[in-house]
Regions:
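Short internal beta-strands
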Residues: 170-174
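Structural motif
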Residues: 98-99, 146-149, 175
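Glycine-rich, anion-gripping cofactor-binding loops and their flanking helix/strand elements
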Residues: 128-164, 194-208
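Conserved small/polar residues in nucleotide/adenosyl-binding loops
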Residues: 218-225
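Flexible glycine/proline-rich, aromatic-decorated loop/lid segments
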Residues: 1-27, 32-35, 175-191
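Short glycine/serine/threonine-rich phosphate/pyrophosphate-binding segments
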Residues: 7, 102-107, 152-157
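Active-site phosphate/pyrophosphate-binding segments
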Residues: 11-142, 220
Length: 226
Protein backbone atom coordinates (compact mmCIF):
# COMPACT_ATOMS: atom_id res chain seq x y z
CA UNK A 1 0.00 0.00 0.00
CA UNK A 2 2.80 2.43 0.87
CA UNK A 3 4.87 3.51 -2.13
CA UNK A 4 8.57 3.13 -1.44
CA UNK A 5 8.08 1.02 1.70
CA UNK A 6 10.69 -1.52 2.79
CA UNK A 7 8.70 -4.45 1.39
CA UNK A 8 8.23 -2.64 -1.92
CA UNK A 9 11.96 -1.97 -2.21
CA UNK A 10 12.79 -5.60 -1.40
CA UNK A 11 10.37 -7.01 -3.99
CA UNK A 12 11.04 -7.72 -7.66
CA UNK A 13 7.56 -6.53 -8.65
CA UNK A 14 4.91 -4.64 -6.71
CA UNK A 15 1.14 -4.26 -6.97
CA UNK A 16 0.04 -1.27 -4.91
CA UNK A 17 -3.42 -1.32 -3.35
CA UNK A 18 -3.76 2.48 -3.19
CA UNK A 19 -5.86 2.38 -0.03
CA UNK A 20 -4.52 5.71 1.15
CA UNK A 21 -2.85 6.42 4.50
CA UNK A 22 -3.73 3.82 7.13
CA UNK A 23 -4.26 5.69 10.37
CA UNK A 24 -5.61 2.92 12.57
CA UNK A 25 -3.49 0.19 14.14
CA UNK A 26 -6.02 -2.37 12.90
CA UNK A 27 -5.25 -1.63 9.19
CA UNK A 28 -8.72 -2.64 8.05
CA UNK A 29 -8.39 -0.76 4.76
CA UNK A 30 -5.25 -2.64 3.84
CA UNK A 31 -6.94 -5.97 4.55
CA UNK A 32 -9.93 -5.19 2.36
CA UNK A 33 -7.92 -3.80 -0.54
CA UNK A 34 -5.45 -6.67 -0.47
CA UNK A 35 -8.34 -9.12 -0.72
CA UNK A 36 -9.61 -7.26 -3.78
CA UNK A 37 -6.20 -7.34 -5.44
CA UNK A 38 -5.97 -11.09 -4.84
CA UNK A 39 -9.42 -11.55 -6.39
CA UNK A 40 -8.33 -9.63 -9.48
CA UNK A 41 -5.09 -11.60 -9.83
CA UNK A 42 -6.96 -14.90 -9.47
CA UNK A 43 -9.56 -13.86 -12.04
CA UNK A 44 -6.90 -12.72 -14.50
CA UNK A 45 -4.94 -15.96 -14.19
CA UNK A 46 -8.06 -18.12 -14.44
CA UNK A 47 -9.06 -16.25 -17.60
CA UNK A 48 -5.63 -16.47 -19.21
CA UNK A 49 -5.27 -20.17 -18.39
CA UNK A 50 -8.73 -20.95 -19.71
CA UNK A 51 -10.01 -22.18 -16.36
CA UNK A 52 -13.16 -20.08 -16.62
CA UNK A 53 -15.24 -18.91 -19.54
CA UNK A 54 -15.37 -15.30 -20.71
CA UNK A 55 -18.89 -15.07 -19.32
CA UNK A 56 -17.79 -16.40 -15.92
CA UNK A 57 -14.91 -13.94 -15.91
CA UNK A 58 -17.21 -11.02 -16.69
CA UNK A 59 -19.70 -12.09 -14.01
CA UNK A 60 -16.93 -12.41 -11.43
CA UNK A 61 -15.58 -8.93 -12.19
CA UNK A 62 -19.11 -7.55 -11.99
CA UNK A 63 -19.50 -9.10 -8.54
CA UNK A 64 -16.22 -7.52 -7.43
CA UNK A 65 -17.46 -4.14 -8.64
CA UNK A 66 -20.66 -4.59 -6.60
CA UNK A 67 -18.79 -5.13 -3.32
CA UNK A 68 -18.71 -1.44 -2.26
CA UNK A 69 -22.51 -1.21 -2.47
CA UNK A 70 -22.88 -4.41 -0.46
CA UNK A 71 -20.45 -3.17 2.17
CA UNK A 72 -22.52 0.02 2.40
CA UNK A 73 -25.61 -2.13 2.89
CA UNK A 74 -23.96 -3.90 5.82
CA UNK A 75 -22.93 -0.59 7.35
CA UNK A 76 -26.57 0.50 7.38
CA UNK A 77 -27.12 -2.13 10.09
CA UNK A 78 -24.09 -1.17 12.17
CA UNK A 79 -26.33 -0.33 15.12
CA UNK A 80 -27.19 -4.03 15.40
CA UNK A 81 -23.50 -4.87 15.76
CA UNK A 82 -23.08 -2.01 18.23
CA UNK A 83 -25.87 -3.52 20.33
CA UNK A 84 -24.11 -6.88 20.38
CA UNK A 85 -20.87 -5.20 21.41
CA UNK A 86 -22.67 -3.54 24.31
CA UNK A 87 -23.79 -6.95 25.53
CA UNK A 88 -20.45 -8.73 25.28
CA UNK A 89 -17.71 -6.12 25.73
CA UNK A 90 -16.96 -7.41 29.23
CA UNK A 91 -16.41 -11.04 28.19
CA UNK A 92 -13.25 -12.68 29.50
CA UNK A 93 -12.70 -14.64 26.27
CA UNK A 94 -14.38 -14.64 22.86
CA UNK A 95 -13.94 -17.45 20.34
CA UNK A 96 -14.44 -17.39 16.58
CA UNK A 97 -15.14 -20.50 14.51
CA UNK A 98 -15.60 -21.17 10.81
CA UNK A 99 -14.81 -23.58 8.01
CA UNK A 100 -12.79 -23.06 4.83
CA UNK A 101 -12.89 -19.34 3.88
CA UNK A 102 -14.93 -18.62 6.99
CA UNK A 103 -12.06 -19.92 9.12
CA UNK A 104 -9.66 -17.51 7.41
CA UNK A 105 -12.02 -14.62 8.13
CA UNK A 106 -12.51 -15.78 11.72
CA UNK A 107 -8.74 -15.43 12.20
CA UNK A 108 -8.95 -11.82 11.07
CA UNK A 109 -11.99 -11.11 13.24
CA UNK A 110 -10.31 -12.56 16.31
CA UNK A 111 -7.10 -10.66 15.59
CA UNK A 112 -8.90 -7.35 15.26
CA UNK A 113 -10.79 -7.89 18.49
CA UNK A 114 -7.76 -8.62 20.65
CA UNK A 115 -5.58 -6.11 18.79
CA UNK A 116 -7.70 -3.11 19.66
CA UNK A 117 -9.74 -4.15 22.71
CA UNK A 118 -7.15 -6.37 24.47
CA UNK A 119 -9.79 -9.01 25.18
CA UNK A 120 -8.52 -12.56 24.88
CA UNK A 121 -9.77 -14.08 21.64
CA UNK A 122 -8.89 -17.09 19.51
CA UNK A 123 -10.13 -18.46 16.19
CA UNK A 124 -10.50 -22.16 15.52
CA UNK A 125 -11.39 -24.31 12.55
CA UNK A 126 -14.94 -25.41 13.33
CA UNK A 127 -14.24 -28.96 12.19
CA UNK A 128 -11.50 -29.34 14.80
CA UNK A 129 -13.50 -28.30 17.85
CA UNK A 130 -13.51 -31.79 19.31
CA UNK A 131 -9.71 -31.91 19.37
CA UNK A 132 -9.45 -30.15 22.73
CA UNK A 133 -10.81 -26.76 21.76
CA UNK A 134 -14.36 -27.44 22.88
CA UNK A 135 -13.12 -27.97 26.44
CA UNK A 136 -12.58 -24.20 26.65
CA UNK A 137 -16.29 -23.55 26.17
CA UNK A 138 -18.29 -22.98 29.35
CA UNK A 139 -21.53 -21.32 30.39
CA UNK A 140 -21.74 -17.81 28.98
CA UNK A 141 -18.77 -18.07 26.61
CA UNK A 142 -19.36 -16.03 23.46
CA UNK A 143 -18.71 -17.94 20.25
CA UNK A 144 -18.88 -16.04 16.95
CA UNK A 145 -19.76 -18.63 14.30
CA UNK A 146 -19.19 -17.80 10.64
CA UNK A 147 -21.29 -19.86 8.23
CA UNK A 148 -21.52 -18.30 4.79
CA UNK A 149 -20.55 -21.10 2.42
CA UNK A 150 -23.36 -23.26 1.05
CA UNK A 151 -21.55 -26.59 1.04
CA UNK A 152 -20.35 -26.40 4.64
CA UNK A 153 -23.25 -24.54 6.21
CA UNK A 154 -24.95 -27.59 7.74
CA UNK A 155 -21.68 -28.82 9.25
CA UNK A 156 -21.05 -25.45 10.87
CA UNK A 157 -24.59 -25.45 12.24
CA UNK A 158 -23.78 -28.80 13.86
CA UNK A 159 -20.75 -27.17 15.48
CA UNK A 160 -22.96 -24.35 16.73
CA UNK A 161 -25.21 -26.92 18.39
CA UNK A 162 -22.16 -28.54 19.99
CA UNK A 163 -20.91 -25.34 21.61
CA UNK A 164 -24.42 -24.38 22.72
CA UNK A 165 -24.70 -27.74 24.44
CA UNK A 166 -21.66 -26.63 26.45
CA UNK A 167 -23.40 -23.41 27.46
CA UNK A 168 -22.01 -21.04 24.84
CA UNK A 169 -23.82 -17.96 23.62
CA UNK A 170 -23.57 -17.92 19.83
CA UNK A 171 -23.47 -14.96 17.48
CA UNK A 172 -23.90 -16.31 13.97
CA UNK A 173 -22.67 -14.48 10.87
CA UNK A 174 -24.18 -15.73 7.64
CA UNK A 175 -25.75 -14.68 4.35
CA UNK A 176 -29.35 -13.55 3.98
CA UNK A 177 -30.32 -16.82 2.32
CA UNK A 178 -29.32 -18.97 5.30
CA UNK A 179 -32.38 -18.49 7.50
CA UNK A 180 -31.71 -21.68 9.49
CA UNK A 181 -28.97 -19.92 11.45
CA UNK A 182 -31.70 -17.95 13.22
CA UNK A 183 -32.99 -21.22 14.68
CA UNK A 184 -29.70 -22.24 16.32
CA UNK A 185 -27.80 -19.03 17.13
CA UNK A 186 -28.73 -16.65 19.92
CA UNK A 187 -28.00 -13.67 17.70
CA UNK A 188 -27.57 -13.50 13.94
CA UNK A 189 -25.84 -10.96 11.71
CA UNK A 190 -26.72 -11.21 8.02
CA UNK A 191 -24.64 -10.13 5.03
CA UNK A 192 -25.75 -9.80 1.39
CA UNK A 193 -25.21 -12.70 -0.98
CA UNK A 194 -22.35 -12.61 -3.48
CA UNK A 195 -20.03 -14.98 -5.30
CA UNK A 196 -18.83 -17.49 -2.71
CA UNK A 197 -15.16 -16.67 -3.30
CA UNK A 198 -15.85 -13.00 -2.53
CA UNK A 199 -17.72 -13.57 0.73
CA UNK A 200 -14.68 -12.80 2.96
CA UNK A 201 -14.83 -9.15 1.86
CA UNK A 202 -18.35 -8.91 3.29
CA UNK A 203 -18.09 -11.31 6.22
CA UNK A 204 -15.20 -9.39 7.73
CA UNK A 205 -17.12 -6.09 7.96
CA UNK A 206 -19.39 -6.98 10.92
CA UNK A 207 -16.38 -8.52 12.66
CA UNK A 208 -14.38 -5.33 12.22
CA UNK A 209 -17.34 -3.32 13.49
CA UNK A 210 -17.73 -5.61 16.47
CA UNK A 211 -14.09 -5.17 17.42
CA UNK A 212 -14.39 -1.41 16.99
CA UNK A 213 -17.47 -1.03 19.19
CA UNK A 214 -16.08 -3.38 21.85
CA UNK A 215 -12.92 -1.27 21.82
CA UNK A 216 -14.88 1.92 22.46
CA UNK A 217 -16.59 0.33 25.45
CA UNK A 218 -13.73 -1.65 26.95
CA UNK A 219 -10.21 -0.66 26.02
CA UNK A 220 -7.67 1.48 27.83
CA UNK A 221 -6.97 4.91 26.29
CA UNK A 222 -3.41 4.21 25.10
CA UNK A 223 -2.51 1.66 22.39
CA UNK A 224 -0.08 -0.98 23.64
CA UNK A 225 1.59 -1.55 20.29
CA UNK A 226 2.06 2.06 19.22
Amino acid sequence: NVVGSAIAKASDDVIYTWAGPEIAVATTKAYSTQLTVIYLIAAYMADKLGKISKEEYADFIKEIESLPDKVAEILKSKEDVQYLASKFYNCHSIFFIGRNLDYAVSLEGSLKLKEISYIHSEAYAAGELKHGTISLIEDGTLVVALATGKNLFDKTVSNVKEVKARGAIVMGVTTEEHEHMDDVADYTVKIPATHEMLLPSLTVIPLQLFGYYVCLLYTSPSPRDS
